[in-house]
Structure formats: structure tokens, C-alpha cells
Design a protein with these regions (language model features):
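A short, N-terminal "cap"/entry segment at the start of jelly-roll beta-barrel domains
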Residues: 1-29, 43, 113-115
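Short strand-connecting beta-turns/loops that link adjacent beta-strands
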Residues: 26-27, 49, 93-94
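Conserved short histidine dyad/triad with adjacent acidic residue
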Residues: 32-48
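Hydrophobic residues in beta-strands and at strand termini
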Residues: 36-38, 56, 80
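Histidine-centered metal-chelating micro-motifs
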Residues: 41-43, 62, 78, 82-88
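Glycine- and acidic-residue-biased ligand/ion/polar-headgroup-sensing regions
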Residues: 49-51, 55-61, 66
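Short acidic-glycine-tyrosine-enriched beta hairpin
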Residues: 67-82
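Ligand-binding loop in jelly-roll beta-barrel domains
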Residues: 82-108
């Protein structure tokens, strides 16, 4: 399977730009690129289905996983097991880009978001 980045329509989610490279496919995992503008955060959430692997491609991001905080830079990885609460924020001075892999694949109905 070949996926062309510029053929994917980005979606907006709480000011995050998400390019879901495997949307609608029934794969064992899913892959997305997330652009996090300066000052934008992802609200507290967790998955009842998937482990999440976030690779920091560009910028700096503060992750909080189960109330522990981590400052991540390009090349760092944050692994969030299924059921663990997390959030993240771009508190840096440049846009951040994250690569996200869900295993098994992402299904919105299994994601829980705290308002």
C-alpha cells in the first residue's frame, strides 16, 4: 500500500491539524501526522482500545501521562498504554509536528475525552 501525503484531506480537531493516513482502513494499526500550533493543547483523554506511540518530529511538546509531566523534543517518543490518561501542549516558540501510531488501529468510539 502506498499513501501520498498531499492526497489526504486534513481534519481539524480542537485546533490540531490531523492527517490520518489510514482512515477508514481495517489495519492492525493506524498512522497519523498531527500539527500542534504554538499554544495549542490536546485535552485529557484515554483510549479503551489502543496503545499510542507519539514520535516528536518537530518542535517541543509537554506531555502529561497519568499526572507525570515530560518535556519532549524532536526524536523523542511517548508511549501511552491503553487506558492511561494523557494530554499534551505545545508551549514552545515553533509549531510542533507529531507522528502517532495506534495499535490496534484508531476507532473514535473507543476514545474518551474529558471536557
Amino acid at each position: 500500500m502506498i499513501i501520498k501525503h498531499d492526497e489526504i484531506e486534513p481534519v481539524e480537531f480542537d485546533k490540531l491539524k490531523i492527517i490520518d493516513c489510514t482512515a477508514g482502513q481495517d489495519n492492525s494499526s493506524s498512522f497519523a501526522e498531527i500539527t500542534v500550533p504554538i499554544g495549542v493543547s490536546h485535552k485529557i483523554s484515554w483510549s479503551n482500545r489502543s496503545d499510542k506511540y507519539y514520535y516528536i518530529s518537530k518542535g517541543n511538546v509537554n506531555f502529561t501521562v497519568n499526572e507525570e509531566s515530560y518535556y519532549l523534543s524532536p526524536g523523542d517518543v511517548c508511549i501511552i498504554p491503553k487506558g492511561h490518561r494523557f494530554s499534551y501542549a505545545n508551549t514552545g516558540s515553533t509549531e510542533a509536528v507529531l507522528i502517532l501510531v495506534h495499535t490496534p488501529s484508531f476507532r473514535l468510539e473507543y476514545e474518551v475525552f474529558v471536557e
